[in-house]
């Protein structure tokens, strides 16, 4: 089970990266009037769907949940007759260690409550520019930095218990999650065929 989840997480992560890279190529081709806006829209939706699939995979195990880690710390047994005392800043520390920019990873709470919102803001900005026919080079929009800060603040203000995965877990659910990811990777492969460049 753990091996399957690890391979699937890696596959999802690589596919997410591939959709963004492919979209970058398609945006440049669109600027040069060599690609249709629909191609960019499809890649944006595929990227969002892949992130949802990653969330579904992460929800299948407590190993990827900060809420579960905190719960295990709270339930720790005494050691040598000494009851453990949980630092009141433990939850904030868990969040900070996971959310900082240089070591973000596959934590369910981050994927579901930070990455999804950041991804939505990213694609909303790009698709708005495409819909407006803005073919100029795009500077990094200051609005995205403000949105990222608001998303971060909301994440820190929301208790981990409220963000914990609620998915039903079992062999059938894991198989469904893996099949869903496989279908999305198949859709991505169709997008990267040389004939699909335009």
Q: Where do the language-model regions lie?
A:
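Catalytic domains of carbohydrate-active enzymes that cleave complex glycans
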Residues: 1-198
């Amino acid at each position: 089970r753990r091996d399957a989840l690890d391979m699937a997480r890696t596959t999802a992560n690589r596919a997410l990266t591939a959709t963004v890279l492919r979209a970058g190529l398609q945006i440049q081709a669109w600027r040069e009037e060599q690609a249709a806006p629909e191609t960019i829209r499809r890649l944006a939706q595929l990227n969002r769907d892949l992130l949802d699939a990653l969330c579904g995979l992460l929800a299948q195990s407590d190993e990827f949940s900060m809420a579960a880690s905190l719960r295990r710390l709270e339930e720790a047994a005494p050691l040598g007759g000494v009851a453990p005392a949980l630092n009141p800043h433990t939850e904030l520390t868990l969040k900070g260690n996971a959310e900082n920019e240089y070591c973000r990873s596959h934590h369910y709470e981050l994927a579901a409550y930070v990455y999804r919102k950041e991804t939505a803001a990213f694609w909303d900005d790009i698709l708005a520019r495409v819909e407006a026919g803005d073919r100029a080079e795009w500077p990094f929009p200051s609005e995205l930095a403000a949105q990222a800060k608001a998303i971060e603040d909301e994440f820190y203000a929301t208790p981990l218990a409220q963000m914990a995965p609620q998915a039903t877990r079992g062999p059938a659910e894991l198989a469904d999650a893996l099949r869903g990811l496989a279908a999305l990777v198949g859709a991505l492969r169709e997008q990267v065929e040389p004939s699909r460049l335009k």
